[in-house]
Amino acid sequence: MAFQGTSRTLTQQSSAATSDDLQKILFSPEAIKKMATECDLGRHHWMRADSAISVRPLVPEVTHGRIASFFKSGYDVGELCSKGYMSVPQVLCAVTRTVSTDAEGSLRIYLADLGDKELSPIDGQCVSLHNHDLPALVSFQPTYDCPMETVGNRKRCFAVVIERHGYIGYTGTTASVCSNWQARFSSKNNNYTHIAAGKTLVLPFNRLAEQTKPSAVARLLKSQLNNIESSQYLLTNAKINQNARSESEELNVESPPAAIGSSSASRSEAFRPQVVNGL
């Protein structure tokens, strides 16, 4: 008998219990931890000489098995119209270098299907980045939804593949790749418009930008001048040389007379500047 379901969401097609089960599979603390440790979702992956090729599935193996079992059980009893599909609207990778710009090397990043033994780029979506091009943002858009199935001993799903080339003499980390995506799961699938892989070069962060503003420069110079003035003319509690007075008298500098009995005259006597030998 043919399936006679209607076009409804997964939550509406299944009961509340099974919907809750799916939520637990996707968003349990264990599933979230697996997404970080196995897939590097939102984490920085370091490209080193001892890991020149990195293949990161977009769904952890354990989570994949549980989701596939959930859809299969619903399909077997006629509650769902398929055994489940994985949909990823977009994968965004932020790539930064961790060596100087004169290092000769490059990265090749693409999206692959683990159901393909050759791990070829999906629809030719592949980006090559030379070291001096970094930093950069790279985006991929799959053109189909991936069936939740097992091919041989491989759990079929999309994966981000990163290859490191060159960097002779650099055995440590030469680049950091942080990937983000949002996987969706449904009992229905679709095909999508083919969009070429996107590559956007990003200007490096200018951490001295604030110091180039006139106001910032003025504040910096003023603070430096104040420091110089303080270091030369501020005295400690040390006693003043008695010869300072005689030298000040020899300078013979006249100041405008102040009115007798005025407050300014008393202040000038109280705050009379002191001259120190050698200054």
UniProtKB/Swiss-Prot annotation:
Q: Does the keyword Transport apply?
A: yes
Q: Where in the cell is it found?
A: Host cell junction, Host plasmodesma
* Alphabetical keyword list: Host cell junction, Transport, Viral movement protein
Q: Which cysteines are joined by disulfide bonds?
A: none
Any one of the GO CC terms: host cell plasmodesma
Spell out the residue ranges making up region: Disordered: 246-279
Listed under GO biological process in this entry are: transport of virus in host, cell to cell
Name where it mostly resides: host cell
Q: Which residues does UniProt assign to the signal peptide? A: none
Which superkingdom? Viruses
In this chain, composition skew of type Low complexity spans 254-268
Coiled coil regions, renumbered to chain = none
Name the family: Belongs to the cucumovirus movement protein family.
Protein function: Transports viral genome to neighboring plant cells directly through plasmosdesmata, without any budding. The movement protein allows efficient cell to cell propagation, by bypassing the host cell wall barrier. Acts by forming a tubular structure at the host plasmodesmata, enlarging it enough to allow free passage of virion capsids.
| Protein name, as recorded | Movement protein
Source organism of this protein record: Cucumber mosaic virus (strain O)
Upper lineage is: Viruses, Riboviria, Orthornavirae, Kitrinoviricota, Alsuviricetes
